[in-house]
A protein has these predicted regions:
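Short, conserved structural micro-motifs that define repeat-unit consensus positions
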Residues: 1-2, 149
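Core catalytic region of metal-dependent phosphoesterases/phosphodiesterases
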Residues: 2, 9, 13-118
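Conserved donor-binding loops in enzymes that form glycosidic bonds
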Residues: 7-8, 130
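His/acidic metal-ligating clusters that form di-metal
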Residues: 39-43, 121-154
Length: 154
């Protein structure tokens, strides 16, 4: 298994600026996914803040995100994991409502909105989403109780 880590992609940045969108799509089309192909990477872990706007996502941004990130992963049968970041949630005090879960449900990869362990070829990794008032105690308890030697977080 080979894993690519990516974080803070902020789709829809700067009020859905076309300049930023063009920059993002160029990166995915000409750098990121060609690298994935060249290095036989089969898993992508996004460490949070896939989207930029906390309160809403425009249809134009969703289409670009789908066409240049989600579909290329599907075309390659990529195993996708995503940790919820602070820009992926509309409320600062809970991760329960989050952009990825609301858009995709359980149809695209594994989404971590609560702290939990994941296993990658037997390597245990603690997945730590955005910490807020609601999940703080649980997150700390899971950090103290895990025997994972690696943690990915936002």
């Amino acid at each position: 298994m080979k894993i690519a880590l990516i974080t803070d992609t902020h789709w829809g940045a700067r009020n859905d600026s076309q300049v930023f969108t063009d920059y993002f799509t160029d990166f995915y089309d000409n750098v990121f996914f060609p690298y994935i192909d060249d290095h036989d990477i089969d898993t992508i872990v996004h460490l949070g803040d896939i989207v930029d706007r906390r309160k809403f996502i425009s249809y134009v941004t969703l289409r670009s995100f789908r066409d240049h990130f989600v579909q290329p992963m599907a075309d390659r049968n990529i195993n996708f994991h995503c940790i919820v970041g602070n820009h992926d949630i509309p409320y600062r005090n809970t991760n329960d409502i989050n952009a990825m879960r609301e858009i995709f449900g359980s149809s695209v990869g594994k989404i971590y909105w609560e702290t939990q362990e994941a296993s990658f070829d037997g390597l245990k990794i603690l997945m730590m989403p955005w910490i807020n008032n609601t999940n703080y105690n649980s997150a700390i308890n899971k950090m103290e109780q895990t025997d994972a030697q690696v943690m990915f977080g936002h």
